[in-house]
A protein has these predicted regions:
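Conserved GNAT acetyl-CoA-binding A-motif
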Residues: 115-127
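Acetyl-CoA-dependent GNAT
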Residues: 1-90, 95-97, 114, 148-152
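Terminal substrate-recognition subdomain of acyl/acetyltransferases
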Residues: 156-161
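Conserved acetyl-CoA-binding loop-helix of GNAT-fold acetyltransferases
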Residues: 94, 100-113, 137-141
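Conserved beta-strand-loop-alpha-helix junction that forms the acyl-donor binding cleft
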Residues: 126-136, 152-155
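Conserved acetyl-CoA-binding loop of GNAT-fold acetyltransferases
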Residues: 140-149
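Conserved SAM-binding loop
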Residues: 3, 100, 128
Length: 161
């Protein structure tokens, strides 16, 4: 597994990655897989499309695609949160087709390795929805500790190198 740059060759694949469950929608037209469309709303993370646009206009954020065996399987966004005054793993997602296989844990460890190369970065924060039980378990397993604080209605976690 590795982190790769988002490029003009792969950006469309990145925005089509989703954590949303596969849903077939019927209407006046033929049924289609809603998961085959880029999503703007995810359960516990902002969409990849939103995140990529955010990183264009706020260049403190670094965006990477997560690749495993030549397949794009996820997305990460990290950098310095100027408003809060700390380094943050702002977004991490693994596509629904690849969840439950340990890829999220591996991907977070890769991001932490990347962030460790930043001289000033001695700790990394992330925040998550209080109902994201699976995510919280993964974060704690890696070594993030709950701060018992909220950030924008999300629980704050900290990882210290």
């Amino acid at each position: 597994m590795k982190l790769v740059d988002i490029t003009k060759e792969n950006w469309k694949k990145v925005i089509f990655l989703t954590t949303n469950k596969k849903v077939t929608i019927q209407g006046n037209r033929e049924p289609y897989d809603a998961g085959s469309m880029p999503t703007l709303c995810e359960d516990f993370v902002a969409s990849n499309a939103f995140s990529i646009v955010q990183s264009v206009y706020d260049n403190r954020w670094i965006t990477k695609a997560i690749e495993h065996e030549d397949q794009l399987i996820g997305f990460a966004m990290y950098g310095y949160n100027e408003e809060e005054g700390f380094y943050e793993l702002c977004r991490i997602m693994i596509d629904r087709e690849y969840q439950g296989k340990g890829y999220g844990t591996q991907a977070i460890k890769l991001v932490l390795e990347e962030m460790r190369t930043i001289d000033e970065c001695k700790e990394v924060y992330l925040s998550t929805d209080p109902e994201n039980i699976v995510g919280k378990h993964v974060y704690e397993k890696i070594g993030f500790a709950a701060e018992n604080k909220m950030l924008d209605d999300e629980e704050l976690y900290k990882y210290v190198y």
